[in-house]
Design a protein with these regions (language model features):
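Small-residue-enriched transmembrane helix starts and helix-helix packing motifs
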Residues: 1-16, 88-112, 135-137, 141, ...
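Structural signal for membrane-spanning alpha-helices in multi-pass inner-membrane proteins
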Residues: 10, 52, 80-83, 108, ...
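Membrane helix-loop-helix hairpins that form the core translocation module of multi-pass transporters
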Residues: 32-97, 101, 149-172
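Juxtamembrane boundary at the C-terminal end of a transmembrane helix
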Residues: 180-189
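Juxtamembrane transmembrane-helix termini in multi-pass membrane transport proteins
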Residues: 1-61, 121-141
């Protein structure tokens, strides 16, 4: 359960103010159909994050060296710095609205999440924990915790949250994970 909760907390905080959260607001505003938008976010996220967690776990299994574990730890620390850089999403994102809210959201979310902070975090969590389903389920829940309120509250939510503070908290969590990994490497049991 620790892996699930760590993954959930880390991604829920990192997602606040992220470009995919801004995309959720944009799609909710454009379609005005919250249930299909939320279903599309869930479908895209579980597919994307299951692949990301699997990739991280597989890479870690192939490269079981200490150097790879140091690279993962360094990756968490770099994620801390990256989290402090605010995201933007173009208002001109071309969403195939003729396909309907669910399909358009699923496609848009899946591709916008590629290379995003939360996807990279999911890869790193998969590499660290080797628990694909716990990581994917946790990161997906984290995405839903951040994005479902964004779909319903949209701009009101963004206006009331200090994104700078949230980004600092997320950066601190990534930093702690990286330092913890380094500590585990230097103090083997």
């Amino acid at each position: 359960m620790e892996i699930f909760f760590t993954s959930t907390l880390l991604v829920a905080i990192a997602e606040i103010g992220d470009k995919t959260m801004l995309l959720a607001i944009l799609l909710a505003t454009r379609f005005k159909k919250p249930v299909p938008v939320i279903a599309g976010i869930f479908t895209a996220t579980i597919a994307n994050h299951a692949l990301a967690a699997w990739a991280g776990s597989t890479l870690a299994s192939i490269f079981m060296s200490e150097a790879f574990r140091y690279a993962v730890a360094t990756g968490f620390i770099l994620m801390a710095a990256w989290t402090l850089v605010p995201d933007k999403v173009d208002d001109d994102i071309n969403v195939a609205s003729q396909r309907g809210a669910f399909v358009a959201t699923t496609i848009a979310f899946f591709f916008v999440e590629m290379g995003d902070k939360t996807q990279v975090a999911t890869i790193a969590l998969g590499a660290q924990y080797h628990a694909v389903w716990a990581v994917a389920a946790g990161t997906t829940l984290g995405m839903m915790i951040a994005n479902v309120p964004a779909v319903f509250l949209g701009e009101q939510l963004v206006a009331k949250i200090s994104l700078r503070t949230v980004h600092k908290i997320a950066a601190a969590l990534f930093l702690v994970l990286g330092l913890w990994q380094f500590w585990e490497l230097s103090n083997p049991a």
